[in-house]
A protein has these predicted regions:
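A shared catalytic/ligand-binding motif for oxyanion handling
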Residues: 1-179
C-alpha cells in the first residue's frame, strides 16, 4: 500500500472479527474503517484512506446484515466541479439468493440517492466483490459506469468499480490476489 502510494484501498473478505483490534491491521499513514461480518467467520469489508485526507464514516447508511461500508473523503485537492468523494466497498457473498441480491441492489440505489441529494457535486465510487450480482439496476438508473473491463477471477468480472465520474479514473489494472 505504501509502496504504491495508494490514497484509498478497499478490501473485501477481510475475515476480521471484533476479536481483532484495529491496531493489528493498521497501516502507518492510513486511517482504517472496517465492517466485520456480524455473524460467523469470513466476509467483512475495510477501507484504508490516506491519513492526510479528511474522512468520515457514513454509519447512517449501514445495515447490520449487509457487508457494505460507506465513507466520505475530502482530499486537499479535487477537480473544481467536485465537492467530495463518496466511497462504498461492498461484499456480496456467493451464497446470496435472488431475494438477498434484490435487497442489496435496492439498498445500493437508496444509498446512492441519499448521497447524491446530500452531495450533488460528489464523485461516487462503489467497489467490491459483487460475485454474480447483476448491477445493471443501479448502473442504469443512476447512470454509473463500470470501470473494470477485464476478468478478475476466471473468465468473470467479479471485482468491480462503478462511478458517476469515469473521466476521473484511469483504466483498472488487475493485480494478483493478496493472501
Amino acid at each position: 500500500v505504501n509502496h504504491n502510494k495508494s490514497s484509498i484501498v478497499a478490501i473485501t473478505e477481510t475475515w476480521l472479527s471484533s476479536d481483532v483490534p484495529d491496531c493489528a491491521c493498521a497501516i502507518s499513514g492510513y486511517n482504517l474503517w472496517r465492517k466485520d461480518r456480524a455473524t460467523g467467520p469470513g466476509g467483512g469489508v475495510a477501507i484504508y484512506v490516506d491519513s492526510d485526507y479528511c474522512t468520515r464514516r457514513v454509519s447512517e447508511l449501514e445495515v447490520d446484515d449487509l457487508e457494505v461500508l460507506w465513507v466520505t473523503i475530502r482530499p486537499k485537492l479535487l477537480p473544481r466541479p467536485l465537492s467530495i468523494l463518496v466511497v462504498a466497498v461492498i461484499y456480496c457473498p456467493p451464497w446470496y439468493n435472488a431475494e438477498c441480491k434484490n435487497r442489496l441492489n435496492k439498498y445500493i440505489i437508496s444509498c446512492l440517492d441519499r448521497m447524491l441529494i446530500k452531495y450533488p457535486d460528489a464523485a461516487i465510487y462503489v467497489m467490491g466483490d459483487f460475485n454474480m450480482l447483476d448491477c445493471s439496476a443501479f448502473t442504469r438508473s443512476m447512470r454509473f459506469s463500470q470501470v473494470v473491463k477485464t476478468a478478475t477471477r476466471g473468465g468473470n468480472i467479479l471485482d468491480k468499480l462503478f462511478t458517476n465520474c469515469p473521466q476521473c479514473y484511469k483504466s483498472a489494472v488487475i493485480l494478483p490476489p493478496i493472501g
